[in-house]
């Protein structure tokens, strides 16, 4: 029959409403892993910038599967993760209505790239942020120690304020991203001492994550602007001869109640939503100073993770990086929060040991043929432009 039956599942998921633009380009982290005080103090999240995607080849290690010990080709995302700088500590107390901020202690010196975060127009400002606060350290520091003692005495959750070193990335933006990251492990006193010792110091990504670990990626998705109801909700197109348009919803509700219900599919914003993508396996935690961070035990070619010509619309990666399986929310250059998994992963895929055989470093602009400039020169010879 050409018409619809009397019943059918609704189009689109109502669990992600309202579908509106995110309040900030850096997505909020609404939950952190459960604290285990028997472990050493460590960060639970890290900040990075999405650089792009590439392809890898590896041998599948899954006994019992038809593809065990066979080569598989998978897509991976590379996230540029320069070391973050610890600039503050926040203590939270538990109340009947949830966590409440007790107090915040900042470091004595803050770089200009994070001070820009507190100004709308840095160029025309007097740049006096935190000058009065820094004077507390110059006097005797008793007030600072008093606030740290309050956190040790009353707080039940300790989080540190960290900011990215955006100047180390290829991005033109000069304003660093600032975020709160929870500290897990150890007692409250040990957490506060850890934060105090790391004031104005950097923390590398390899001290937070390791290979084969399962993590979550939290970011704002790519924006697509105002979109029609058919593409936004996946509703069915109307018949060809329908009056006044086909890509619409024919009936948007009953006569009464005399308003449009919130659950009815309508046109509006699509994309630029805050989303959390869970259970991404880390395939590699690379070092920025390693000139062969794109090589493997099978492919001994000396090459970096950056493809020829750089990642499209991003550039060259000169810092530490993380390679995760699959795609993550956001477009290139987008700030991404990488968080330890909230759950204990026991699946075979999560526990599998990953050993990469080959990483594609051909140009991502067009159909790349060569993995390194040396390989291109050996095939093409001396070009006229190089004479």
UniProtKB/Swiss-Prot annotation:
Extra remark beyond the main annotation: Present with 450 molecules/cell in log phase SD medium.
Official protein name in the record: Large ribosomal subunit protein uL3
UniProt lineage: Eukaryota, Fungi, Dikarya, Ascomycota, Saccharomycotina
GO biological process: cytoplasmic translation; maintenance of translational fidelity; ribosomal large subunit assembly; rRNA processing; translation; translational elongation
Compartment(s) where it occurs, according to its Swiss-Prot or TrEMBL record: Cytoplasm
Primary location group: cytoplasm
Complexes and interactors: Component of the large ribosomal subunit (LSU). Mature yeast ribosomes consist of a small (40S) and a large (60S) subunit. The 40S small subunit contains 1 molecule of ribosomal RNA (18S rRNA) and 33 different proteins (encoded by 57 genes). The large 60S subunit contains 3 rRNA molecules (25S, 5.8S and 5S rRNA) and 46 different proteins (encoded by 81 genes). uL3 forms together with ES39L one of the contact sites for the signal recognition particle that targets ribosomes to the endoplasmic reticulum membrane.
A GO cellular component annotation in the UniProt record: cytosolic large ribosomal subunit
Protein's UniProt keywords contain DNA repair: no
Glycyl lysine isopeptide (Lys-Gly) (interchain with G-Cter in ubiquitin) crosslink, residue number(s): 39, 136
Purpose: Component of the ribosome, a large ribonucleoprotein complex responsible for the synthesis of proteins in the cell. The small ribosomal subunit (SSU) binds messenger RNAs (mRNAs) and translates the encoded message by selecting cognate aminoacyl-transfer RNA (tRNA) molecules. The large subunit (LSU) contains the ribosomal catalytic site termed the peptidyl transferase center (PTC), which catalyzes the formation of peptide bonds, thereby polymerizing the amino acids delivered by tRNAs into a polypeptide chain.
Family: Belongs to the universal ribosomal protein uL3 family.
Source organism per UniProt: Saccharomyces cerevisiae (strain ATCC 204508 / S288c)
Signal peptide positions on this chain: none
PTM annotation (Phosphothreonine): residues: 103
Keywords, comma-separated and alphabetical: Cytoplasm, Isopeptide bond, Methylation, Phosphoprotein, Ribonucleoprotein, Ribosomal protein, Ubl conjugation
Residues found modified as Pros-methylhistidine: 243
Positions where Phosphoserine occurs in the chain: 24, 156, 297
MF annotations from Gene Ontology: RNA binding; structural constituent of ribosome
């Amino acid at each position: 029959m050409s018409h619809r039956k009397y019943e059918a599942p609704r189009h689109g998921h109502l669990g992600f409403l309202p579908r509106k633009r995110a309040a900030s380009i850096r997505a909020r982290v609404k939950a952190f892993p459960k604290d285990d005080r028997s472990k050493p103090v460590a960060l639970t999240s890290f900040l990075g910038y999405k650089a792009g995607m590439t392809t890898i080849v590896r041998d599948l290690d899954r006994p019992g599967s038809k593809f065990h010990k066979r080569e598989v080709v998978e897509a991976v995302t590379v996230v540029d993760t320069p070391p973050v700088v610890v600039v503050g500590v926040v203590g939270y107390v538990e109340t009947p209505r949830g966590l409440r901020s007790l107090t915040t202690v900042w470091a004595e010196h803050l770089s200009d790239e994070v001070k820009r975060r507190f100004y709308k127009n840095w160029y025309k400002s007097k740049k006096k942020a935190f000058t009065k606060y820094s004077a507390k350290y110059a006097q005797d520091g008793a007030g600072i120690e008093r606030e740290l003692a309050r956190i040790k005495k009353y707080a039940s959750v300790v989080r540190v304020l960290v900011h990215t070193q955006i100047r180390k990335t290829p991005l033109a933006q000069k304003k660093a991203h600032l975020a709160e990251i929870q500290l897990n492990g150890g007692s409250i006193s040990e957490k506060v001492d850890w934060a105090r010792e790391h004031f104005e110091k950097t923390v590398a990504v390899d001290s937070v994550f390791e290979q084969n670990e399962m993590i979550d990626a939290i970011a704002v998705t790519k924006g697509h602007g105002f979109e029609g109801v058919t593409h936004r909700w996946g509703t069915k197109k109307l018949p060809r001869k329908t009056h006044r348009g086909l890509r619409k919803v024919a009936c948007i509700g009953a006569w009464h109640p005399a308003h449009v219900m919130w659950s009815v599919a309508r046109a509006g914003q699509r994309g630029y939503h805050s989303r959390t993508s869970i259970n991404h396996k880390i395939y590699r935690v690379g070092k920025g100073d390693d000139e062969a961070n794109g090589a493997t035990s099978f492919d001994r070619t000396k090459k970096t993770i950056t493809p020829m010509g750089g990642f499209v619309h991003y550039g060259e990666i000169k810092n530490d990086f993380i390679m995760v399986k699959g795609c993550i929310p956001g477009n290139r250059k987008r700030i991404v929060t990488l968080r330890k998994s909230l759950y204990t992963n026991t699946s075979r895929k999560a526990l599998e040991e990953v050993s990469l055989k080959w990483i594609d470093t051909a140009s991502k602009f067009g159909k790349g043929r060569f993995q390194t400039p040396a390989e291109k020169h050996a095939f093409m010879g001396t070009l006229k432009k190089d004479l």
